[in-house]
């Protein structure tokens, strides 16, 4: 697989070199960002998203990709500022909250003093919580697979953050919710590794 990634990097750089920046849709910018992120070209993916935002102002998905690429490149602080602006602008979606929580989680992991660790753990839990409660998992039907998958990510991460913040009751509560989500996914035919691992 790594050989395939190495082969595609030059092709993607060439694709960006000849990319029609003025006429391309936000969807085309987004797709190129996704391709670049998939092969580890995080800084170039960020540049693509930022360029796309010059032509497609306030495109939520491009903002998310720019921040996600920065986070992957090791700049969670800058990524968190971008995502905080999205939230302040009214974006209450699961994806934005989860990306922001993930940036806070990275800052928590990178922190060396206990005050910073506590602060970023609390921020991550709060944002994962916002993402999780955007759609109450209790109201989701097994047939709503995509929504269930979307709910799983913030839910299991709340459990993770509670566990490493020594709140074992909170960790257990959200681990159980994540397990129930996986049961619903499995009953709907979803049988990926992370569903089995959670159960």
Spans of model-derived segments:
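Long, compositionally biased charged/polar accessory segments in the mid-to-C-terminal portions
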Residues: 42, 139, 183-186
